UniProtKB/Swiss-Prot annotation:
Active site annotation, chain numbering: 23 (proton acceptor), 101 (proton donor)
Role: Catalyzes a trans-dehydration via an enolate intermediate.
GO terms, molecular function: 3-dehydroquinate dehydratase activity
UniProt-listed CDD domains: DHQase_II (cd00466)
UniProt KW Cell membrane keyword: no
EC class: lyase
Catalytic reaction(s) noted: 3-dehydroquinate = 3-dehydroshikimate + H2O
Alphabetical list of PANTHER family matching this protein: CATABOLIC 3-DEHYDROQUINASE
Source organism: Xanthomonas campestris pv. campestris (strain B100)
Name of the protein described by the UniProt record: 3-dehydroquinate dehydratase
Gene3D superfamilies (UniProt xref): Dehydroquinase, class II
SUPFAM superfamilies (alphabetical): Type II 3-dehydroquinate dehydratase (SSF52304)
A single GO BP: amino acid biosynthetic process
């Protein structure tokens, strides 16, 4: 059994109502509940945290090094394009992570095309709406099974 951590960046608390044509109609609570259920069905635990504050996400990443977290799933949202501190935190704890995006940032505004995390991620899944999270979790579960 592995302990997994799912982090959501800024404005994802507005899922379901914020630009549903871009981000879909699923709420964050619905996404989290489905993922927790899937992780449990595979014999793992999944903790979820959303924050609009970068330092809260950084501190949670730091804590992951000590709490037995095996893998981090992260949708950094707008911090994707701006946060050296998230990058440094993820590299500092040395845990594998998957970068997740509901939309495909490469089909959007040019400022969204650069990620400070992608080159260090175990994988990047984007463009599939709420299914991006499910696909990321399935990839992590498969990796854990392969490596065990």
């Amino acid at each position: 059994m592995a302990h997994l951590l799912l982090l959501h960046g800024p404005n994802l608390n507005l899922l379901g109502t914020r630009e549903p044509e871009v981000y879909g109609r699923n709420t964050l609570a619905q996404i989290d509940a489905a993922l927790v259920d899937r992780a449990q069905a595979a014999g793992h635990t999944l903790d979820c945290l959303q924050s609009n504050a970068e330092h809260v996400l950084v501190e949670r990443i730091h804590a992951a090094r000590e709490d037995g977290t095996a893998f981090i799933l992260i949708n950094p949202a707008a911090f994707t394009h701006t946060s050296v501190s998230l990058r440094d935190a993820l590299l500092g704890v040395g845990l594998p992570f998957v970068e997740i995006h509901l939309s495909n940032p490469h089909t959007r505004e040019p400022f969204r095309h650069h990620s400070y995390l992608s080159d260090k991620a175990a994988g990047v899944i984007c463009g599939f709406g709420a299914d991006s999270y499910r696909l990321a979790l399935e990839a992590v579960i498969a990796r854990l099974e392969r490596d065990s």
